[in-house]
């Protein structure tokens, strides 16, 4: 008779426990136990509980390799979902086996779990283990399907549970709820989130903090009448009163300094879209700036050509926005442009705008605006650039390059790598809640009647078109941060704190990934010979990059260094890249003139005509402003249930070497955090968006 001591850990989130009957079968190399119900006097499997049980077997089962958890009805009680963290079994020889689960069992089902040691296909020799990993992948591919979101954009997750059950209503003539929440100014497609699978949903705590924060704020806007006013703002200072209780050092700085050229240029380096600017070695033909135009702003003893040769001239080109039609908002036609902005990095360390053209096509009706133009001409020209920044940031840098790309990485991981695979264990913490927040994003932003349709000058179709163009230009090198800085020519630009911090985090990730990868992949042949890894990479190329070869994304990985770079890129994209463009959104956008989502007058075609009144009449109206800020406030306010970068409470790795690597990674991140905070003490405007304690492991908000 062999005795096995079993520990079963239930999740800590509300309603993780179950009243259903749970049984266990243990499979070893020398036999299999009978199915035994796990039950003792009192409540079993309560939320947060770690329950102890004893399983008796007729013989020693040898090395334990698989367990099966059977969830069945208990008496007359209704079905009750259960979240299992893990199962630990102490064998008669005192060896402890760990079986990670970290998933919901919703219905009456059997869940097979492997022992936690990370293994590639080449490491498995037992037929039962090979069959188990194949069956796991087959089951996940049957459940998780790709779905076209918008042609030309990364595909996303289409799950059978997305579709609501047949409508049951006593009155068949009763109209179906249209999706509006009373008092909320935009349509929310609740169906896109309501039927999401439990394993992809927010925790109860996160859901409650997210939605219960949204409702009261929307109601407050309604009671104050802000979402019903379709007129211009009367005074700029009134915009400060939208969020009177959410002021920060940065948001106050933005409101006070937004008109200054130095702050305008600073945002290209350390704002919320710091990856757009690039060094200019030659003025493009479509932007006919002359030395006579900009000489007064370059300093004495130099000229435009000299500054170009020194590498002090930078360009922000918004050609991706060219030619996209606009829509009407609140009964008024909106306007649009694709500006070009030339900047100069001076000896005083300031990045200063020196010329702005509000079109991609030069001509007599498209003047080049300069800092010595009238105050309101120059300010409105800069505001048009900030308007273009809104779309460059929200559509490309934020939604496309972090959320949608990250979701594709996540789905490809779930479909192609079994739980025992080392890369699954390494990357699964960086996929947490990604699908849920993207479902909310589509429900809030990218549906008919949503934010893009009701508060953006480009509307839903135009906003999607910007993302499609963004994906058509996206490259693998641009997602690998060190390569991106070199390609844009900003690798040695002083005062670029985003670059300094992102490289520090990237290299810390790279060291961590290197230690994990080299532990499981001793040579290049192990990488090239891993079919599950290769299928994961191929599916990302197919479903995320849509098989576009010009993207430079690999279709296979052949060497250990290639795998290290690829995995680091995925990890960085799903964590730090998102933090850099998301965390500061409200601080930089709460002062609406710094980040307008729409413009109500056309771009200026001549100089000297802009006044304060025309400036105010060009900015978004009160309703549009408040709709945008309400949604951004909701999406930027981090709810509870955070997991900072490097915090891995779920035990996926059990080997000593990976555990040491995880601890070393945390120590490196702590040092980076300390360095950032020490630097910020000396700055008038701190940059902390890539402080590891503020970076989430995953895209979860």
From Swiss-Prot:
Family annotation (SMART domains): LH2
Record's GO cellular component terms: membrane; perinuclear region of cytoplasm
Main localisation: cytoplasm
Q: Where in the cell is it found?
A: Cytoplasm; Cytoplasm, Perinuclear region
- Which cysteines bridge via disulfide bonds? none
Q: What is its EC number?
A: 1.13.11.-
What controls how active this protein is? Increased by calcium.
Residue intervals of the Lipoxygenase domain: 120-701
Reaction(s) catalysed by this chain, per the record, are: (5Z,8Z,11Z,14Z)-eicosatetraenoate + O2 = (12R)-hydroperoxy-(5Z,8Z,10E,14Z)-eicosatetraenoate; N-[omega-(9Z,12Z)-octadecadienoyloxy]acyl-beta-D-glucosyl-(1<->1)-octadecasphing-4E-enine + O2 = N-[omega-(9R)-hydroperoxy-(10E,12Z)-octadecadienoyloxy]acyl-beta-D-glucosyl-(1<->1)-octadecasphing-4E-enine; a N-[omega-(9Z,12Z)-octadecadienoyloxy]-acylsphin-4E-enine + O2 = a N-[omega-(9R)-hydroperoxy-(10E,12Z)-octadecadienoyloxy]-acylsphin-4E-enine; (6Z,9Z,12Z)-octadecatrienoate + O2 = 10-hydroperoxy-(6Z,8E,12Z)-octadecatrienoate
Annotated Pfam families: Lipoxygenase, PLAT
Note the InterPro entries from the entry.
LipOase, LipOase_C, LipOase_C_sf, LipOase_CS, LipOase_Fe_BS, LipOase_mml, PLAT/LH2_dom, PLAT/LH2_dom_sf
Q: Which residues cross the membrane?
A: none
Q: Which cofactor does it need?
A: Fe cation
Recorded GO molecular functions are: arachidonate 12(R)-lipoxygenase activity; arachidonate 12(S)-lipoxygenase activity; arachidonate 8(R)-lipoxygenase activity; iron ion binding; linoleate 9S-lipoxygenase activity; oxidoreductase activity, acting on single donors with incorporation of molecular oxygen, incorporation of two atoms of oxygen
Which pathway does this chain act in?
Lipid metabolism; hydroperoxy eicosatetraenoic acid biosynthesis; Lipid metabolism; sphingolipid metabolism
State the family named in the UniProt similarity comment for this chain.
Belongs to the lipoxygenase family.
Q: What does this protein do?
A: Catalyzes the regio and stereo-specific incorporation of a single molecule of dioxygen into free and esterified polyunsaturated fatty acids generating lipid hydroperoxides that can be further reduced to the corresponding hydroxy species. In the skin, acts upstream of ALOXE3 on the lineolate moiety of esterified omega-hydroxyacyl-sphingosine (EOS) ceramides to produce an epoxy-ketone derivative, a crucial step in the conjugation of omega-hydroxyceramide to membrane proteins.
What is this protein's record name?
Answer: Arachidonate 12-lipoxygenase, 12R-type
Phylogenetic classification of the source organism = Eukaryota, Metazoa, Chordata, Craniata, Vertebrata
